[in-house]
Structures are given as structure tokens and as C-alpha cells.
Amino acid sequence: MASIEQVGAREILDSRGNPTVEVEVLLEDGSFARAAVPSGASTGEHEAVELRDGGARYGGKGVEKAVEAVLGEIAPAIIGIDATEQRTVDQALLDADGTPDKSRLGANALLGASLAVARAAAESSGLELFRYVGGPNAHVLPVPMMNILNGGAHADTGVDVQEFMVAPIGAPSFKESLRWGAEVYHSLKSVLKEKGLSTGLGDEGGFAPDVAGTKEALDLITIAVNKTGLKLGTDVALALDVAATEFYTDGTGYKFEGKNRTAAEMAAFYAELIDAYPLVSIEDPLDEDDWDGWVALTDQIGNKVQLVGDDLFVTNPERLEEGIVKGAANALLVKVNQIGTLTETLDAVDLAHRNGYKTMMSHRSGETEDTTIADLAVAVGSGQIKTGAPARSERVAKYNQLLRIEENLGDAARYAGEVAFPRFAFEA
């Protein structure tokens, strides 16, 4: 019997030295698993709410209340339920919390329990997590969207765009894509050194030089790619996470690169970029509530580049449904802690795919050694994963898990490559 017998929890540290929640689940048949919850730096207003302690301890960021929520309310709510009935488990979690934004018990407490149950159920079933969640047909390895240059809320520099990513779209396998990305990463380090720029790292392992702006950063990455012998646009494409909500203010608009800009002016800037660089994806190009701007932008350049809603959708099926109806964006960023349970995450992905939206599985800037998102990317066939630079162990843990999954799949493994993206902005 795979019913839940015990649930435990503890406070651990994430990659930024801040507390987070780890949950452990033991089943009646002896199967055991644990899951740790990530945390973001740039968070959407519409995300499910993390429960933090406040006060002086850990600067107010302690999670002892969330741990108490797991032990005191979540455990009694799910003990005795069959762990293989994930939707039943997650509904019990939602019922126990009873709030639309999960603010009473905390999305961090709920998610830890939800993911730990799924891991324990996979263990009980004798299956790898990607196979347990994804079924017999899960076999596509995602393109790693490697954040090799950090700005915005992830770095203390003047660069407004939060992430500059390389995507090894032309690689024949995930293993080779990882090598290509790592080689570009090290090439960029040498380019920065040659130019006398900082090689200090941001939260996600990318370099954080203080360069003049977006185009200058893209030019540096272009040089780095060319130095490796890889072809920009065919072997390696570029992608951005603008995180525009971080520099948007009601009344004044977007304060970007020293100027106040309208949504239309931001759109014109992006149109310039996709004409000049091999950009295949732009995440959060506009504010999370600028629906009119998003619709206009999607109409203007959505046939040339992937437009990813992160803060816009917060992995929430209701927000995504609104975007689909309005015609905003053409892809969904998937962050399990934005919504708080595995079932709701899978529902959001299913809704996206059924409506022709691409999906990109994603980490958070405050990560742990937990590798769940690597398995989920393969399970749901996202074809894209964003989990930082090929450096820092909390990032590399996910990439290494994908290497194991590719090896596990053997000849059945397929690397998503360029077909992961709905269209291209650049032809080499």
C-alpha cells in the first residue's frame, strides 16, 4: 500500500543563504522521499504567497511558521491518502489552506509536501520521477536556456535586463548542448577579462559585469560564441528575461536604460533587437498587468520570437486562460512555487500546450540541490528549461540530472533542439 504514513519538515538554506522549506514523506510500504522549495528574487504580484516568519531571525526570512504548518496541519490532512493519487493529495492541501493565494499555510509549505509526495510515489512505483509523472511516452530532453550574463534584480549593476541566455539549439543531444553552453560560458569569462570587466557572479551563476546596456551585453555574448567556433543563430541562439515589472511604474511607464518609455517604445526596441541578433525568446518584456501592451506586442512581433509570460501568468491556469483569450504572449514560464502544487502546475502546462503555447520549465534565483524541475521538464515535454549558468552546484544539479535522464532513455531520448521554439527571428 502506498498510503502516506509520516510527514516531516525542516528549515534549510537556499543558494542565497536564505531559509527555505524541506519536506519529507514516508509511505506505508517504506518508500521515502524529500523535496526542497525554491524562492524567487523578482516575484510576480499574482504569485502564491510564501510564508515567512518576520522578526529579527534571518532578517525576517525564517520559515519556522511554514515548517509548523507542515507538521501541524498539512501532515494530518494528507496522512492516510494513497500517494499515487496526486490530485487527491493536492486537493487536500488546498482545502487545508483554504485561501486563494495559499497565504494561510504558505505556498512553500504546500509545495514541499506536494513534491515530496510525488517523489515518494515514484519511489514506491519503482519509476524515475520523469517517467512516473510523464508516463511511457516522456522522452524529450529540453534545450537548456543558460543564463550566462546577469543584470536586473539578480545583480548589483546598471544593466536593466535581468537575464541574457544562450540556447544551444543546434546540438545533437542534451549532453552536447551542455558542453556547448559551458564552453560559451568560459569563453565569455575570458572576453570579460580581456575587456577589463568584472567576472563576479550573479545569483544564478552568470557573470555580472557593469556594461552600458542591453546591446553591449549581447555584443559581448556574440564575441564569446564566435570565439568557441560555434555558429551564432544555427548552433547557439540568444534569449532574454527582461523582468520588465521590476522597472515599471504606474504613471511614468518603463524606466529603461535611462529613459522613461511607453509599451509601444519598448516594443520598438525589441523589434530592433530581433532584427539585429538571433533572439528566439524574450521573457516578461512588459509589466505583469500591462495586458494591452502585451497584446499589441504579441501582435507586432509574436510571429518572429517566443514571448514568454512569467510574472504575467505566474503558472496560474486562470491568468493563463485570460492571456489565451486576449492573445497575450505565446509561451508560459513554469515555476512550481508560483502556484504551489504539482497538480496545478501540470494543469497550467496542459492548458498551455492545448492552446498552442510553448512552455519553459524554470528554477528560481534562490535554489537548492533539489532536481525535481529537471524531471518535470522531460515529463511534460516542455522542450525548454531555464536553470541558470553551467556553474554553481544548485544550478548544475539540474543539468546533471538531465544527463542521467538522457542516459536512462538511451536510444529513445530525443533532444528538442530548434523545434522547441515556435519560430525564429534570425536566419544564418
Swiss-Prot record:
Superkingdom of origin: Bacteria
InterPro entries to which the protein is assigned, alphabetical: Enolase, Enolase-like_C_sf, Enolase-like_N, Enolase_C, Enolase_CS, Enolase_N
Molecular function GO labels: magnesium ion binding; phosphopyruvate hydratase activity
Gene Ontology biological-process entries: glycolytic process
Catalytic activity: (2R)-2-phosphoglycerate = phosphoenolpyruvate + H2O
PROSITE patterns hit by this protein: ENOLASE (PS00164)
Primary localization: cytoplasm
Enzyme Commission numbers on file: 4.2.1.11
Membership in a protein family: Belongs to the enolase family.
Function per UniProt: Catalyzes the reversible conversion of 2-phosphoglycerate (2-PG) into phosphoenolpyruvate (PEP). It is essential for the degradation of carbohydrates via glycolysis.
Stored NCBIfam families: eno
The protein's name: Enolase
